[in-house]
UniProtKB/Swiss-Prot annotation:
It comes from Stenotrophomonas maltophilia (strain K279a). This is NADH-quinone oxidoreductase subunit K. It is found in: Cell inner membrane. NCBIfam families: PRK05715.1-2, PRK05715.1-3, PRK05715.1-5. GO terms for biological process: ATP synthesis coupled electron transport. It is an enzyme of class 7 (translocase). Keywords: Cell inner membrane, Cell membrane, Membrane, NAD, Quinone, Translocase, Transmembrane, Transmembrane helix, Transport, Ubiquinone.
Length: 101
């Protein structure tokens, strides 16, 4: 049986992996977006665990809102990434130093 401790441990491990991905790789935009998505999913696991433990479905409902925001964030991030690659021919964060049009 999966307990709250198992879900919290999994959420903490995934959050730590995503945090390490953000801090260790600051050059590639795709890895940064994937790390942010993994961070949101680890928070969702914690919401589901607490919702299940307390018997309140509002935490699981909140997960759907987070997933919707995460999908919109990924779509906008990838659109910006495609535009950035078309104009600058790079996805390296270090080479993008200004937001001039």
């Amino acid at each position: 049986m999966i307990t709250l401790g198992h879900m919290l441990a999994l959420g903490a491990v995934l959050f730590a992996i995503s945090l390490a991905g953000i801090f260790l790789n600051r050059k590639n935009v795709i890895v940064l977006l994937m790390s942010i998505e993994l961070m949101l999913l680890s928070v969702n696991i914690n919401f589901v665990g607490f919702s299940r433990q307390l018997g309140d479905p509002s935490g699981q409902l909140f997960v759907f809102f987070i997933l919707t925001v995460a999908a919109a964030e990924a779509a906008i991030g990838l659109a910006i990434l495609v535009t950035l690659f078309r104009t600058r021919r790079t996805i390296n964060v270090g080479e993008v130093d200004s937001l001039k049009g």
